[in-house]
């Protein structure tokens, strides 16, 4: 099947293209995180071009983004004969692995062991700010954090209290899930709902394009809010419906073999 003559593919790419300004380097991070995160996984320059250019991104922009990612320590590049190959550095693999559970988790978190940390205004703020860098904490206000898991034992300058039940007020829900995030999630949900089942003969590169677009859009939603159970979600939050649509489509687009990405379709 000619990659340039597939109406379903072209329409779906247009549907999934991020309505916000796309950062090409971020698209490439999503691509490697999905298709080539494992140690030793490599993608050729021609395969990258074949996957990314259908999104309306020019080869020159891909080269600039790769240069930035090399400079930032995410990606290494090498020559294989006349071809270029690209792969994640150890730093890049670690960064990708750190967010993989969030991106590919099929349900929201369901922790049951909550605690509150309260810092003295001023002197304890630095310690609280450090705690809030951990993924299992959210800020309630300037001096209070809510966390799940065991209560830390090395925070002598803060008050700690276990919480047996939680009632989440609307103002905190709105702070954790602000309106622009809710709107971005709703837009993704609406786009996914309009996509019909994939045809049976997509090329490996076309599959890579679609998976990258889906993961990139979902990543931009799911990594912008804490991983919290439904009691924290606003009434208009569509994240869980969106999550089901994301994985319903990804399941119909199995990961392509990396070697197959170098073979153009007939």
Predicted regions and their residues:
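Short alpha-helical segments that sit at the start of domains
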Residues: 2-31
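Short acidic, hydrophobic short linear motifs in intrinsically disordered regions
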Residues: 39-51
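C-terminal regulatory/effector modules of DNA-binding transcriptional regulators
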Residues: 176-266
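Short, Lys/Arg-rich nucleic-acid/phosphate-binding segment
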Residues: 79-85
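Glycine-centered, phosphate/nucleic-acid-interacting loop/turn motifs that mediate DNA/RNA or nucleotide
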Residues: 73
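Short, hydrophobic-biased segments on the C-terminal half of alpha helices
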Residues: 63-67
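Short, amphipathic alpha-helical interaction segments positioned at domain boundaries
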Residues: 93-115
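Mid-protein regulatory/catalytic core that forms ligand/cofactor-binding pockets
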Residues: 122-206
């Amino acid at each position: 099947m000619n990659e340039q003559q597939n109406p379903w593919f072209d329409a779906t790419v247009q549907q999934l293209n991020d309505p916000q300004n796309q950062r090409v380097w971020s698209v490439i991070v999503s691509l490697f995180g999905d298709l080539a995160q494992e140690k030793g996984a490599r993608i050729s320059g021609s395969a990258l071009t074949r996957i990314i250019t259908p999104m309306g991104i020019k080869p020159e922009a891909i080269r600039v983004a790769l240069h930035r990612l090399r400079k930032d320590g995410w990606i290494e590049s090498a020559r294989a004969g006349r071809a270029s190959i690209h792969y994640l550095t150890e730093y890049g693999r670690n960064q990708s692995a750190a967010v993989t559970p969030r991106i590919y988790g099929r349900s929201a978190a369901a922790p049951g062991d909550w605690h509150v940390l309260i810092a003295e205004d001023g002197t304890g703020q630095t310690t609280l700010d450090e705690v809030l860098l951990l993924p299992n904490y959210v800020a309630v206000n300037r001096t209070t954090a809510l966390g799940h898991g065991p209560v830390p034992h090395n925070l002598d300058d803060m008050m700690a209290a276990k919480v047996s039940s939680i009632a989440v007020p609307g103002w905190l829900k709105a702070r954790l899930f602000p309106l622009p995030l809710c709107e971005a999630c709703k837009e993704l949900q609406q786009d996914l709902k309009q996509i019909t089942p994939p045809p049976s003969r997509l090329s490996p590169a076309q599959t890579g394009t679609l998976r990258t677009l889906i993961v990139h859009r979902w990543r931009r939603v799911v990594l912008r809010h804490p991983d919290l159970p439904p009691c924290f979600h606003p009434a208009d939050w569509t994240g869980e419906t969106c999550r089901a649509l994301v994985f319903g489509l990804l399941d119909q687009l199995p990961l392509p073999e990396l070697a197959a990405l170098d073979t153009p379709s007939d």
